Structures are given as structure tokens and as C-alpha cells.
């Protein structure tokens, strides 16, 4: 998979390395030169920077020294603790870092074959729906012979500095990494989906049930190979880097390096005792300033845990920036968690698999309202439905749906200055079961995301069976940009873009006719259906000019709520729309009755309560039961 990563800027690693070895020169990257242009957007702030190769910084340079560890990393002078925290999380997952650092053994320095070294490295990152292979030379920025950005504990270990350089190249320059987002880096390292969680909402510090539920979700992400980060929000500039009395630092992104339930007690008593404590281990990218509260490295609470359990957890008494704390304390002191879940789409896995739909789209401006695709959020009602629209289906009675929208990063496309993200979000609407054309009026809103100027927005929601439309938007109309929409469901969702506003006119339209009316039929429910020992297992079918829409079966009730809609583009207005009610049975379904709907050219959404009829009867009430229906009709095909 990763050997097929797309070459960034068409730079081929193997070809460039072969050329350097043939010429016996060290690689110099023309696309990311050792100049101030690679450091800053504008100007040359700070001390004079000298670019040096690892061999000029130390005697025995290595990619890794004694393997890779979350303890390897330290933050540099740029405000990129978010990136260092993401790297710390990455370092704890061998299967993940080996994808980001491909063929690491081949890239490692070989003291026995110095002539095989060409000063060139490559790293893989997931960007905007695909893996890209980014090439860098080994020249690194230094001041007084010290690396000024991300660096390792060991002076001769360079993997983190080189990964950071490749990431800076992808972003445009090193300055672009100042004040970035951990969620973005976690996605770029994994191709997963980041879910931000605000710990200040929902009374998590005091509500044990909610806290336990969240811990189980965090534990599941960790146990299935995902990456997690946590932070304490700095409200003001003065808050940045402020140290709390408990030792935690505001404005820092901490890497979560372990999550587990810790058994309390000693010996057999501990084995049979049911009491366990929800614990989480974190690491500060600065490698110091640890938590000093309960369960810190030297706290007496560790006496409650057996020596073997402590050894298994890796508890050490060192000021190395890594520490344990209870999840309750974490919810009390931290304000944000980012869970980057690895979406499992493999059918061979024992864990839950997801079906992923991935679609690229864009917000574009146009003077013609039918071609404009930048309508802004729902606040702008006149233009909202001009945005891109995507339809998908939930095919189970209820399904957990994960939705992510990511805008194309602008940092790497604006060398004259820092590219700002647009404020983006999306709404999800429950629509007719057979909708094939774009929405033009409001329907039931099933869910909605927040609007925020981050690179991506995520929503996890439970949706009942049916068809839905996602409308991704910028907050303000007229803003343009590309985006990637990802929809994850338990079964295939058939997600696709709705491009047409109405049925297209073809050469057959003059012969077969063209729709004169659009009709939306909403069957709300029924009452008084034919008695059954176990209650009716009923469903409805809406029929119109050869097209059918069927509801889900409502089991064990004579007063079902169908809440099903159909939309029909009508050519033969004299023909009525028929709504049939059926009882589902094992061998053969039973007909319970039907109603006919005659529509006016412009029917309002009036509620009709109609008695069921037999198929051949003209009498209004010869069968038990009534059905409640709303009908909306319009001669304008873009009215609904």
C-alpha cells in the first residue's frame, strides 16, 4: 500500500538516490533548499541559522539509536508541541511509524558502507485522501551546532528531525508548523479519522456514568492501534506555557502513551478483587514538568498496586515527562482529547469493520444560482441549497455513522503568508427514500456538526434506517475551496453526489412526456389496523406512475408510525397516487387496505386522515384502519 504512495512534486526517491550515488554527491533538495525561504514565510527573524548535515553535528549519526521510543522526542524553538506530541504517539505504534518511515533499514546510516549514503530520505504522509512520498535532504537548521526544532534525547539520533523536515516541506516551511493542530498530524500519520472531544462539556469530572462511557471509547481506540492526544486550553496569550500547581502545562499537547484498567491490591486478593482503576499515561513533549498529583511517579498511591503490575505498566521514578494519572483526574484538569481512530475496513479482522465512502468535492462560485456551489451555512437560507449535496443510505434499523469533512490544506499553497482555514461544517437531512435529485427546501434535520476553522470536522451519530443528504458548507457564502468527504457505515451506504436539480430533458421527452409536477408524499402512520394475536407487522407502499417506495416493517402494533417519504415527478396528473398498507407474514404478506390521493397543481402540506379501502371498493370505510398522510405538490420541479 505505502510503496505505491504518490511521489510528492514528482520527486522519485529511488531515481534521485541512484543519481547521487552515481555522481558521488550528497543530495540537495531544490524544492526545499537550505535557505530562509524554507524556514519562514517572510523575513529572517531570530538568530542566524546554519544548515548542517548530521555528519557535521555528530560523529556517528543514526536514524534510530536503540530503537524508537516516545521518550526520544523534545520540542524545539518553534511552537510545535502539537507535532511533537503526535510523533510521540506515533513512536509507540511500530506498525504505524514503519508506514510513515518506509524501508527504514535501507534508509539507516551504514558505517560499514559509507559510500552507500546519499544524504536523501523519504517519508510517507496521508494528505487529502492519498498517501504521498515526501523527499528531503539531510541538511537541518542549527544554531550553535544545536538543532533548533524537534530533536532527540540522543544527539546522534535524527529520525524525528528528518520527519519534521519532510512535514515542514509539505506544509510550505518550518514556520507553518507554529501553532498547528495535533488532530491534523495524527490523521496525516495514519489516514485515520480524528475525533475531538471537549472535556469541559457534559460534567465528565462529576458524572461517573458519562466518564466511564468515554473511558471505554478511549480504551477501545487505544487497544485497536489508534493515536490519542490531550491538552489544556490556554485562553489567553499569558496562559500559554503556564504551569499549574499540579505540574501540568497549559497550551501543551500531551501524547497519550497507554490506557488501561489497573487492578488494585496484592497477590491472590488482587486477582479476585473486582476493583479496578481507569488509568491513562501521558507524555509532555518537553520531556519534563510532570503531573505531581495522585499516581504521579513518587506518590504513595502506587503502594496499592503490586510490584508485578507496576513493572507491567512501566512505572519509573524519573523526570522524563511521562506519567500516570486517573481518568477522573484527567477529565478534571484537561480540557480536550483528540482520538484518532484507525478505521478498520478489512473483512478478515475480528474487530468491527467499516464501509468507507470517500468523495472529493469543491465549493465554487458562479453567478448562475444553479451552478453556484458556495452558498454558506443555513443562516443564508436563499443560497444554502446551492451547496454541494451528497446522498447516502442507512440500511440497518439503526447504525452508527462516522462522517468527516476535510478541506484541502492552504498552508502549502501560500508561500507569501500563512494560509488560513475556512470555517466549515455540515448538516444531515432525512429525505425521501427515492430521492435522486438535489434538495431545494428544508426537511427534517437528522444531525449537524459544529462550524470551525479547522482543517477537518468530524461527527459520530446514530441514524435510523433511511436515506439522508449531507450538505457540507463554508460558514459564509462565496468562499471557495476543495474538500474531502468520508462517510463510514456498517454496511455499504451507496454515497454519491447529487448533481442534477430535476429530471433531465432527453430526446425521449417529446415522445414520452416530461414531468409537469413534483409530489412529496409523507406517510406518518396508521391506526386501528386489523387485529392480530401478536399485533400487526405492517408496512406501507407508496405507488405513483410505476414507481414504488416502501417503508420498514413496524412490528407488533396496530398503531404504527411509518414516517416514510417518497418524491415523484409526475407526467400523468389524472392518475391518483396510491398508498397501500400490508401485514408482513412468513409465507405471504396480507393486504390491509389502501387509499388514493388526488393532487392539485399546488397542494400545500396539509394533513389528510383517510380510511382504508379495499382494492375494488368505492366505499370509504369498508376496511378497518386509517392512515395519516401529508402531500406537497408543485408545478415547479425545484420546489422540494
UniProtKB/Swiss-Prot annotation:
Q: What class of enzyme is it?
A: hydrolase
One term of GO molecular function: calcium-dependent cysteine-type endopeptidase activity
The catalytic site is made up of: 81, 252, 284
Instruction: List, for all copies, the residue spans of the domain called C2.
Output: 499-617
| Keywords, in A-Z order | Hydrolase, Protease, Thiol protease
The record, for Gene3D superfamilies, names: 2.60.120.380, C2 domain (2.60.40.150), Cysteine proteinases (3.90.70.10)
The protein's matches in InterPro entries, at most eight in alphabetical order, are given as: C2_Calpain, C2_dom, C2_domain_sf, C2_III, Calpain_cysteine_protease, Calpain_domain_III, Calpain_III, Calpain_III_sf
Q: Which CDD domains match?
A: C2_Calpain, Calpain_III, CysPc
| BP-aspect Gene Ontology terms | proteolysis
Q: Where is this region: Domain III?
A: 344-496
Q: What is its EC number?
A: 3.4.22.-
Presence of keyword Metal-binding: no
| Annotated Calpain catalytic domain residues | 26-343
What GO CC annotations are associated with the protein?
cell surface; synapse
Instruction: Give the family this protein belongs to, as stated in its UniProt record.
Output: Belongs to the peptidase C2 family.
Q: What does this protein do?
A: Calcium-regulated non-lysosomal thiol-protease.
Which protein is depicted?
Answer: Calpain-5
Source organism (scientific name)? Mus musculus
